[in-house]
Regions:
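Conserved class I S-adenosyl-L-methionine
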Residues: 2-69, 71-78
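Class I SAM-dependent methyltransferase SAM/SAH-binding core
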Residues: 82-129
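A short acidic, Gly/Pro-enriched loop at the edge of an enzyme's catalytic core
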Residues: 132-141
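A short SAM/SAH-binding and catalytic strip from SAM-dependent methyltransferases
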Residues: 140-155
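SAM-dependent methyltransferase
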Residues: 175-235, 245-252
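Core SAM-dependent methyltransferase catalytic element
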Residues: 259-277
Length: 277
């Protein structure tokens, strides 16, 4: 873990010193210890966390081994405290957690020590630059709970997707969740917000339609990019990924949306299950 002096230097980095794809708000988030320490308690009971776990489990199946008898490997990009990886490790998977937050990785390793026999691999890395990960070794790559949306600028989000494709085995599976900006149109002032966001994106090359900056857990400028379904499909396809299932989630992300009528407005988010081209 970083010393107090090193942590202070990290937290005070100038904006021009931040890694690609990392906004000031995201940097504040990943360098604030309290965010990681309180993460599990803060998010406990959120329905999406149970829903995505069940969907991942259903698609990956019960077997932790490949046809040659070796253990299957799962990589979680933006792993946080390891909520997706620890259940897989308990089944016998080998797991790799990737996060920009040293404090999140520390929480992940601490939890794993208490819950699983084999220690996971924990890697600090920028989601836009994952060259540290080898080609074709992962049976599953996860990027859940809108971790993709925390990456600033489209080219950096596509870079993450391309790396996910690259590290997958030939029959591996990529899971990704994003929030849906179409649901804005149902909110009071949502139409105006969408129009103003579109105009801002036209005038400011550093702003993209779907970008959002807001106060969050004591941080003044948390960043999140919120997708449309069409944008998500285009980015996955451009990154060499084939969508096998795209689940539209209900407004509260507690279950899969039923019916297709005005789904782009009714859905609170999307969970895509993909393979390589």
């Amino acid at each position: 873990m970083p010393t107090t002096a090193n942590r202070s230097r990290e937290q005070s980095r100038a904006s021009w010193q931040l890694p690609d794809g990392v906004s000031r708000g995201t940097w504040d988030y990943v360098t604030e210890p309290a965010i990681a320490i309180d993460y599990d308690r803060f998010h406990a009971g959120h329905p999406l966390l149970e829903l995505d776990r069940k969907l991942i489990e259903a698609h990956l199946g019960p077997s932790p081994t490949r046809s040659d008898g070796s253990s299957r490997i799962a990589v979680d990009l933006g792993c946080g405290t390891g909520r997706n990886l620890i259940p897989l490790a308990n089944l016998g998977w080998r797991v790799v957690g990737v996060d920009l937050s040293l404090d999140m990785l520390g929480q992940f390793k601490s939890k794993a020590k208490s819950h699983v026999q084999s220690q996971p691999v924990a890697i600090r890395a920028n989601m836009a630059h994952l060259e540290c990960l080898a080609d074709g070794f992962a049976d599953a790559v996860l990027c859940m709970y809108s971790s993709l949306g925390m990456v600033q600028r489209r080219e950096n989000r596509r870079s993450l997707m391309k790396h996910a494709r690259r590290i997958l085995t030939s029959n591996g599976t990529f899971f990704v969740h994003v929030h849906n900006r179409g649901s804005w149109l149902r909110d009071p002032g949502g139409v105006r917000r969408t129009i103003m966001d579109w105009l801002r994106a036209r005038r400011n090359s550093n702003w993209e339609l779907g970008d959002s900056v807001y106060a969050y857990r004591g941080l003044p400028s948390m960043f999140l990019h919120i997708y449309s379904e069409r944008e998500l499909r285009r980015d996955l396809n451009a990154s060499g990924l084939v969508i096998k299932n795209l689940y539209r989630l209900n407004r509260h992300s507690s279950e899969i949306l039923t019916g297709t009528w005005l789904a782009h407005l009714r859905s609170g988010g999307f969970l895509a299950v993909c393979t390589r081209h």
